[in-house]
């Protein structure tokens, strides 16, 4: 099988030296890529800017902005069996990007933001998709409720949710998986490398069940 995996943050430029981003380290996405490779599968890893070396057996695509990640994902989704959208893609970007560095000249500066294109939602809207679609959700409260709502709104097959205060910029995480049929599965706090191997098993099992239903 072929796994398409996104990882890391995106950077939305304000001017040539400043940007909007987030604290995602990319460790979870990279660990999933390694686990899928260990299981003998092909991997397409689409990554925002991180301080990690890509798995040498993966097809690696480096991006910076949400638009670049959107385009790369759509280019490769249909050739994939499992799409794992683990990246922390910016929800908003500056409406205008200054071609020169913005100078400090006032006590307050307003920055107009507009929505970025929603990668998970755009894949969920595809008719007759053949790939398993997995989204991720980092939350600070109401973990299961927010994950369930995201699953329904984005029309994906499962959501892997975590408390952002536990998993951000660390080597460990604690996960709650919400499935399309309403079932949930909790994986207790553990190293991300261990969690990644458990997730790959779950993804493969879900994809096999999906294929069986379609036959």
Regions found by a protein language model. Name each.
Residues 1-215:
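A cross-family phosphate/adenosyl-ligand binding-site feature
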């Amino acid at each position: 099988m072929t796994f398409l995996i996104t990882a890391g943050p995106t950077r939305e430029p304000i001017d040539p030296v400043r940007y909007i981003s987030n604290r995602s380290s990319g460790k979870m996405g990279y660990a999933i890529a390694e686990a899928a490779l260990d299981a003998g599968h092909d991997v397409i890893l689409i990554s925002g800017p991180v301080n990690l070396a890509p798995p040498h057996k993966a097809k690696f695509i480096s991006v910076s902005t949400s638009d670049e990640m959107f385009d790369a994902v759509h280019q490769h989704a249909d050739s994939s069996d499992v799409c794992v959208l683990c990246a922390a893609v910016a929800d908003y970007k500056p409406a205008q990007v200054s071609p020169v560095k913005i100078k400090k000249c006032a006590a307050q500066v307003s920055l107009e933001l507009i929505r970025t294109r929603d990668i998970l939602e755009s894949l969920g809207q595809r008719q007759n998709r053949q790939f398993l679609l997995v989204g991720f959700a980092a939350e600070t409260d109401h973990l299961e409720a927010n994950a369930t709502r995201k699953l329904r709104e984005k029309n994906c097959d499962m959501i892997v949710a975590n408390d952002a205060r536990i998993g951000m910029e660390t080597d460990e995480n604690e996960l709650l998986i919400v499935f399309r049929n309403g079932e949930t599965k909790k994986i207790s706090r553990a190293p991300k490398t261990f969690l990644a191997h458990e997730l790959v098993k779950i993804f493969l099992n879900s994809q096999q069940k999906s294929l069986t239903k379609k036959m």
